[in-house]
Curated annotation (Swiss-Prot):
Lineage: Bacteria, Bacillati, Bacillota, Bacilli, Bacillales
Positions of modified residues (N-formylmethionine): M1
Source organism per UniProt: Staphylococcus aureus (strain MW2)
Protein name: Phenol-soluble modulin alpha 1 peptide
InterPro entries found in the cross-reference section: PSM_alpha
Family: Belongs to the phenol-soluble modulin alpha peptides family.
Inducing or repressing factors: Up-regulated by agr.
Length: 21
């Protein structure tokens, strides 16, 4: 669960960077 949650967090961060750009 921890690994999956970490991956989701990273993906969300990348999406925010692209959309926030």
């Amino acid at each position: 669960m921890g690994i999956i949650a970490g991956i989701i967090k990273v993906i969300k961060s990348l999406i925010e960077q692209f959309t926030g750009k």
